[in-house]
Curated annotation (Swiss-Prot):
GO terms for biological process: proteolysis involved in protein catabolic process. One of its GO terms (cellular component) is HslUV protease complex. Coiled coil: none annotated. The gene is hslV. The active site is at T7. It catalyses: ATP-dependent cleavage of peptide bonds with broad specificity. A double ring-shaped homohexamer of HslV is capped on each side by a ring-shaped HslU homohexamer. The assembly of the HslU/HslV complex is dependent on binding of ATP. This is ATP-dependent protease subunit HslV. Keywords: Allosteric enzyme, Cytoplasm, Hydrolase, Metal-binding, Protease, Sodium, Threonine protease. GO terms for molecular function: metal ion binding; threonine-type endopeptidase activity. It comes from Acidovorax ebreus (strain TPSY). HAMAP family: HslV (MF_00248).
Length: 181
């Protein structure tokens, strides 16, 4: 799967006595080639009346187009995350304009966490961890270790994992946006 430079997006799900915790976060760095042009971008947001978390890796304008399309699919399918993701992916693969978009989405609600790609993939990774972007592998590894070996809440796991990714990936910074459900 192609990884885009310039960001790290991570989502973690954790079952607790109080229910399922879901957190999704990302760093704020935007690069143009090897130059940092912005350090405080917001690549994570809540969609569908605050019930869905979404983050992107890739071209910013493309990602905003995908956010709009994805939110429209969520509205059409009454917030059914998986169905909306599949419908978006169908459009992404068949529409001439959408087909050229270079971005990936990480989305989550209380029922699922998914990666949506322009290759036509809707992936639900195991263990409730979704990681995309250039620092995704670092953040995923850190989150997996923290999820297995600590009782930290999901949001804290996302925070600490993004910090570790920021220490290792030159395209990831320490300015984080973290949303929770």
């Amino acid at each position: 799967m192609e990884q885009y430079h310039g960001t790290t997006i991570l989502s973690v799900r954790r079952q607790t006595a109080d229910g399922i915790q879901v957190a999704l976060g990302g760093d704020g760095q935007v690069t143009l080639g090897n130059i940092v042009v912005k350090g405080t971008a917001r690549k994570v947001r809540k969609l569908y009346q605050g019930r869905v978390l979404a983050g992107f890796a890739g071209a910013t304008a493309d990602a905003f187009t995908l956010f709009e399309r994805f939110e429209a699919k969520l509205e059409k399918h009454q917030g059914q995350l998986t169905r909306a993701a599949i419908e978006l992916t169908k459009d992404w693969r068949t529409d001439r304009v959408l087909r050229r978009l270079e971005a990936m989405l990480a989305v989550a609600d209380h029922s699922a966490s998914l990666i949506i790609t322009g290759n036509g993939d809707v992936l639900e990774p195991e263990q409730g961890i979704v990681a995309i972007g250039s620092g995704g592998a670092y953040a995923h590894s850190a989150a997996k270790a923290l999820l297995s070996n600590t009782d930290l809440p999901a949001a804290e796991i996302v925070k600490k994992s993004l910090e570790i990714a920021g220490e290792l990936c030159i395209y990831t910074n320490m300015h984080h946006t973290i949303e929770t459900l």
